[in-house]
């Protein structure tokens, strides 16, 4: 297909017009081509992509009078009005009797700056007859529409002063020039046939049979179209919403809690010992503040830690430190939210989940960040069992698209029995995605909870890495536009 065959009729009209005049403004091109200015410029830009014309742009500055500037063209600038009034040295007080104090104030500075007068002991002394200044000539040159500096015969210094005085205003206009290139000129001289072409086969053309006598515009199927990047939800946010929707469909209530928690709810209520490495292993962000402990629970929790309370448990032994429990931290897991919710709702049945951010002092690398999302959930009912927990988690992962799910024994301070759910991923094998179990009586008893509680905490970011095929967790939080554009909207 020749270049000429690939030109639309509008492109040909523009090219022929430019062959005659060489270059033109959009308005001149409209006149010579017979096209509307928008259609002419659209054709010009298409010709530019083909190398047949060039489109240059420059900013053109024009100026017009403000309302105040227009008024001064009739009455004269404040300094001109006062200098014309001055026939002899006159006190400023007397001037304020003839002119407004505001005008006298404005004029005084400009009279001195221009050398038209001087101030001696509160008296304005004229310097003699003065000719019109450049600024006055510039104001007088304004008539009608906005003008350039050249059109009003002014200079940058004068116009700058008038802008500062808010007597004129600047308008910036984009000025385009379309010029034919050597390649475009060579093509135009070969002769361009102006023939109407049909770009779309419509039902009307088919019904009437008129398509038989029409020439259709040829299409090139070998050209790759430009990529279009429409707006879409961030892939990580989309996965979080998918998880949220799954639990809502399973009848769970979503709960929220503060990111600042006391050590009591973050550690002690979950039966994590105060002098055990379990706390240090969390790499906690400790805050320089404390809070009051819940009076209805802390003594029972303290007794559970020290000697096992009123149940068949030995506790952790040692003395429980109330002040240590009052210290605030950035929550290291969202379990602090769910256990607090259970304390407020100790009666069965309860089905609640929380998808929110947790914080740990981690070194940033491809698999760790100091901030991460966690999916926490609890189910409390007198008929619940460990088998129900496994079935519930398996159902969740199946709905997330993982066909094979298994569970391995695990250990957590606040659940027994405990498991770690794993899913099978091609190329990676079995991947662990969190922890789960049944709350120990050491956790539930001090809070007044009598029925079994199934609990789990699942790693959202790790699951997202598997679903999105990422090897670097940091991509989920970075503004990598190329990755975001190429990310899948959905997977079937």
UniProtKB/Swiss-Prot annotation:
PROSITE patterns: AA_TRNA_LIGASE_II. SUPFAM superfamilies: Class II aaRS and biotin synthetases (SSF55681). InterPro entries: aa-tRNA-synth_II (IPR006195), aa-tRNA-synth_II/BPL/LPL (IPR045864), Phe-tRNA-synth_IIc_asu (IPR004529), Phe_tRNA_ligase_alpha_bac/arc (IPR022917), Phenylalanyl-tRNA_Synthase (IPR002319). It is found in: Cytoplasm. It comes from the Archaea. Belongs to the class-II aminoacyl-tRNA synthetase family. Phe-tRNA synthetase alpha subunit type 2 subfamily. Binds 2 magnesium ions per tetramer. It holds the Pfam family tRNA-synt_2d. One of its GO terms (cellular component) is cytoplasm. This is Phenylalanine--tRNA ligase alpha subunit. L-phenylalanine binds at residues 335, 374-376, 414, 439. Keywords: Aminoacyl-tRNA synthetase, ATP-binding, Cytoplasm, Ligase, Magnesium, Metal-binding, Nucleotide-binding, Protein biosynthesis. Mg(2+) binds at residue 416. Tetramer of two alpha and two beta subunits. One of its GO terms (biological process) is phenylalanyl-tRNA aminoacylation. It catalyses: tRNA(Phe) + L-phenylalanine + ATP = L-phenylalanyl-tRNA(Phe) + AMP + diphosphate + H(+). NCBIfam families: pheS (TIGR00468), PRK04172.1 (NF003210). Its EC number is 6.1.1.20. The keyword Iron does not apply. Its cofactor is Mg(2+). HAMAP family: Phe_tRNA_synth_alpha2. GO terms for molecular function: ATP binding; magnesium ion binding; phenylalanine-tRNA ligase activity; tRNA binding.
